[in-house]
């Protein structure tokens, strides 16, 4: 195989026929994984916070059980099956044509959110109850104590677990072939069909690309933990104590 042919096939693995055609290959894998990871993290953390608050309200615990049941159902459904359902059910429910990539991102985000919610709920419980009680004793509202004291610490505790879920999401994008999305693995199959004599080289290059993507994600928690140091968490207490002391100081003056 000539150098020109190698570069041509490598370009197809990276971006597909873009800009003369739709974006595909590794670029589409990264784009779908990024959207799915962001959506899954936001929804998953939101569900964990909601479950925490619902459990504190005896008359709404049935709603917490219903939400847990829904999340458990999403975790039990195979990702491939969920993509297939999303591909057919979302356009039927909305009554409009929905791009295949949107259905894949929706399915990946739903599954990821279910796992992240479970992880974050465990992280919230891992934070000592004494810290929440101390915040309440200082006059914080329960939701305020949860969001400003407990959640930042739970986030740092569960970062490795979140990174594992993000890596799984990247790898699960390879299942998008079921709805005809030409992501990295599908693009590799197309390249291999053109160069039948070089399957090891083609799929070896794909393995390297997946390794680089997943390694970058696994390194992300270390950077995030460095940017959310305990000093940052303690500053929340300092700001709150200053806010509590300000009315008393104003009254004296």
Predicted regions and their residues:
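Transmembrane alpha-helices and adjacent helix-loop boundaries
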Residues: 1-253
């Amino acid at each position: 195989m000539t150098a020109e042919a190698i570069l041509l096939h490598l370009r197809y693995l990276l971006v597909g026929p873009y800009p003369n055609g739709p974006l595909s290959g590794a670029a589409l894998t990264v784009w779908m994984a990024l959207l799915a990871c962001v959506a899954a993290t936001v929804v998953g953390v939101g569900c964990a916070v909601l479950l925490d608050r619902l459990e504190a309200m005896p008359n709404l615990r049935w709603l917490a059980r219903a939400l847990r049941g829904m999340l458990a159902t999403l975790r039990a459904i195979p990702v491939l099956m969920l993509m297939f359902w999303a591909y057919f059910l979302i356009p039927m429910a909305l009554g409009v044509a929905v791009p295949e990539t949107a259905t894949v991102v929706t399915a990946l985000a739903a599954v990821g959110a279910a796992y992240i919610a479970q992880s974050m709920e465990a992280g919230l419980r891992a934070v000592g109850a004494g810290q929440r009680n101390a915040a309440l004793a200082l006059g914080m509202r329960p939701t305020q104590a949860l969001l400003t004291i407990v959640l930042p610490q739970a986030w740092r505790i569960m970062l490795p677990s979140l990174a594992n879920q993000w890596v799984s999401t990247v790898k699960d994008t390879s299942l998008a072939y079921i709805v005809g999305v030409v992501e990295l693995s599908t693009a590799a199959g197309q390249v291999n069909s053109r160069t039948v004599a070089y399957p090891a080289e083609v799929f070896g290059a794909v393995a390297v690309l997946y390794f680089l993507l997943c390694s970058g994600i696994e390194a992300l928690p270390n950077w995030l933990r460095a940017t959310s140091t305990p000093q940052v968490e303690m500053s929340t207490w300092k700001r709150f104590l200053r806010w509590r002391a300000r009315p008393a100081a104003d009254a004296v003056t």
